Amino acid sequence: MKANLLVLLCALAAADADTICIGYHANNSTDTVDTVLEKNVTVTHSVNLLEDSHNGKLCRLKGIAPLQLGKCNIAGWLLGNPECDPLLPVRSWSYIVETPNSENGICYPGDFIDYEELREQLSSVSSFERFEIFPKESSWPNHNTNGVTAACSHEGKSSFYRNLLWLTEKEGSYPKLKNSYVNKKGKEVLVLWGIHHPPNSKEQQNLYQNENAYVSVVTSNYNRRFTPEIAERPKVRDQAGRMNYYWTLLKPGDTIIFEANGNLIAPMYAFALSRGFGSGIITSNASMHECNTKCQTPLGAINSSLPYQNIHPVTIGECPKYVRSAKLRMVTGLRNIPSIQSRGLFGAIAGFIEGGWTGMIDGWYGYHHQNEQGSGYAADQKSTQNAINGITNKVNTVIEKMNIQFTAVGKEFNKLEKRMENLNKKVDDGFLDIWTYNAELLVLLENERTLDFHDSNVKNLYEKVKSQLKNNAKEIGNGCFEFYHKCDNECMESVRNGTYDYPKYSEESKLNREKVDGVKLESMGIYQILAIYSTVASSLVLLVSLGAISFWMCSNGSLQCRICI
């Protein structure tokens, strides 16, 4: 009875003891992140680094409208296909939009030489000046400048390219021509021309009066001599002849010289180019809307400051880097493991606290105390703020380093460069895989470091309290300490702010600690006596029982007993 009473008193004393616990914040967040060692770790706070949404629209880029080619393509626009007349007034744009199935390109059949390279050059042009390089009325007085064809009809009538002149015989003669232009524009000038290849000698004679014609085009770094290739060909757009189209970029101060005695499709208009790093060409079926953006893709505009996107690899403007990842989320908070009430209030970050506190809302790490005056939470503002500053700086640094926004336009290859195109795709895929791997690895490593950082902070807070209390309190697990003395709210605050007065409470703690130890010792002594008594009594009962059984068996003859002297 005495032992039971002492044990009960000890239990009551423990139940009334003041306690303080170290813990961390938890909330109802369902955000999950991946680390090097774990997947789908639920955390209290995180930031998304991957943009996966767009508005499905073509928008102005930094306030400047794009050039929509509509049913025309680059070739039809630059040569001046009559069906592209609405594009003639255009002088500037933010980017150029082609549709996948544009109908109006070159109208007279033939090849546009180095067309893909020209598109690449135009991808960095944001405006141009269209000007008469060789005026129609004065440049070719001895030749007919009104050549037209049904292949380039407009409104039901034969016509021709708006930027070129088809020079033919005049009054039965095609005298040798020579004309030049000096670039005084102070910028590169794009010059286009063509060479006509008739289907037979009769047409050659009728148009140019010369069966041995040639065309010569010369600049300081371009020198070509062309001769017509007269041959029967299958009809395209009802034409058995062909025209090949050529271009060159004339540098400032340079001169271009045209010399011919037939078959020249002469330039009438040229373009003084102004380069712009934010321009580009995209192929898209999206429609134009009244909106503004800093980043345009063929699928739609992206308005985001995130460093990565998985929407489209082709982008115009200040755009996130394209990666193939489906998720890139960086942790900024803690593991989110709310404490389970059936286990008690306190429970483990860093392996010694089983769960976080949803009741602590003003910090990441802190305390929960319980004494005669009640109980409550208090965040440790200093460690929380230091952690927030460190993680915020880290996230900003990561985003700043990876947020290299730029234009990524597709490369152009003609049908004869299929192997080069395939090789380029493999190279691009390789770079894309590297970018994706680097982005994912960076996030995994930083998430691991952040969660370890939080674990370390909680441990440090625990050790800070432990070093103050020393033997004035005992560790009871789950990040908690039980005081050997009364600790009111003022005392609790001193523990939290690091000013706990150990000597002040050491005498009271010593007495209470000795009482508790004495109760344990006395209880242990009584239990030992009871154990010995129980063992002896059990042995005596066993011996008496064995003797009774032996006497009974002897009396009925089942057991013979012989006593020898």
UniProtKB/Swiss-Prot annotation:
Keywords: Clathrin- and caveolin-independent endocytosis of virus by host, Clathrin-mediated endocytosis of virus by host, Disulfide bond, Fusion of virus membrane with host endosomal membrane, Fusion of virus membrane with host membrane, Glycoprotein, Hemagglutinin, Host cell membrane, Host membrane, Host-virus interaction, Lipoprotein, Membrane, Palmitate, Signal, Transmembrane, Transmembrane helix, Viral attachment to host cell, Viral envelope protein, Viral penetration into host cytoplasm, Virion, Virus endocytosis by host, Virus entry into host cell. It is found in: Virion membrane; Host apical cell membrane. Palmitoylated. In natural infection, inactive HA is matured into HA1 and HA2 outside the cell by one or more trypsin-like, arginine-specific endoprotease secreted by the bronchial epithelial cells. One identified protease that may be involved in this process is secreted in lungs by club cells. The record marks 343-344 as: Cleavage. Residues 18-528 are extracellular. One of its GO terms (molecular function) is host cell surface receptor binding. Residues 550-565 are cytoplasmic. It comes from the Viruses. Major glycoprotein, comprises over 80% of the envelope proteins present in virus particle. This is Hemagglutinin. It comes from Influenza A virus (strain A/Puerto Rico/8/1934 H1N1).
